Amino acid sequence: MLPLVTSGSVERLRPAARTVLLTAVAMLAFATNSLLCRLALRDAQIDAASSGSLRLVSGALMLAIVVRAGAGRPPPRADWLAAAMLFAYVACFSFAYLSVNAATRAPILFGAVQLTMFAAGLHAGERFTAPGWVGMAAAVAGLLYLVSPGVSAPTPGGVVLMSAAGVAWGVYSLRGRGLADPLAATAGNFLLAAPMALALSAVFAGRFHPTTRGALLAVASGALTSGIGYVVWYAALKHLAAMRAAAVQLSVPPIAACGAVLFLAERPTWRLAIASAAILGGIALVLASRAHGKTAPQAQRPPDTR
C-alpha cells in the first residue's frame, strides 16, 4: 500500500525534506506499478492494448475526481506533447513487455530514460561533480549486476518499443519540471491521452482478452500507482535537476525486486542485496554531491502557471 501523503503535511516540511519525501513516494509508486503490470501482462491476464487503455482511462477518471474536489482549481492548459508522450510510454511499454524479458527490459528502458534526461540536462548546462559521476557509475553498475543473469538478446521490435517507451517517459518527465500545479497538469495529460489509448484498443480489437483479474490490476495501476503516482512525481520534479531526476529512477528496479520478495513470494538473493546497495548508495552519492551549472528545474523550461 502506498503511504498517504497529504498536501498539508508535505507543505510543512522543509524544501529539501519535501523533495526527498515526494521522490521516495514516487519511486515506490513506480515500483508498485511495475509489479501490477507484471501480474497482469506476464500471465496473459489482459492484452497490451486493453491494459494501456484501462490504465489511462482509470487514471483520467481518478484525477478528474480529485481535481473536481479541489475548490477553485483552474482548468489545466492542454499540453499535447506531454499527453502524447504519456500515451507513447504506456502503449510502447505494454507491447514491449510481451517480447522483452525482465532482465533485458530494465537496461533498455532505463538506459533510454537516462540518455534522454541526461542529454536535456547537459544541454541546459547541468554538470555533475566527480563524486556525482562516481555515484552514477555505481548505480548503473548495480543495475547491470542485478539483471545480468537473465539478459538475453531481445527481438528487434521489442528493443525499438522499449527504447521508445524510455524516451517518451524521459520527455514526459522533463515536461513536468517547473509546473505550478502538478495535479491539474497530470489530470490534463491523462484526459488527453485516454482517447489515444482507446483508439489503439479499437485497432487491436481482435486481440481483446482481458480477464476480470487483469482488468482490476490495470485499473489499480492506472488510478493509483500511475495517476496519483505521476502527480507526486511531477511535484518532486519542481525541485530536481534533470540529471538527478534521471539518476533517482534507477532505484525502481531494486525496489520492485524487493517488493516481489515481500508480496510475490520470490526468493531473496545476495545478488539483489549487493545490487540494491550499489544502486541506492550510488544514487545517494549523486544527490549528496553538488552539481555545477544550471541545476534549477526552470533552466530547462520556463515556469508554467498551470
Where are these regions (language model features)?
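Glycine-/small-residue-enriched transmembrane alpha-helix faces in small-molecule transporters
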Residues: 1-53, 84, 88-92, 141, ...
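Specific alpha-helical transmembrane segments that line the substrate/conduction pathway
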Residues: 50-61, 86, 94-127, 165, ...
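Transmembrane alpha-helices of multi-pass small-molecule transport proteins
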Residues: 2, 44-88, 112-120, 168-172, ...
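C-terminal-most transmembrane helix of multi-pass membrane proteins
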Residues: 2-12, 56, 250-306
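Hydrophobic transmembrane alpha-helices of multi-pass small-molecule transport proteins
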Residues: 63, 86, 128-148, 165, ...
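Juxtamembrane helix-entry segments on the extracytoplasmic side of multipass membrane proteins
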Residues: 15-20, 44-53, 74-76, 133, ...
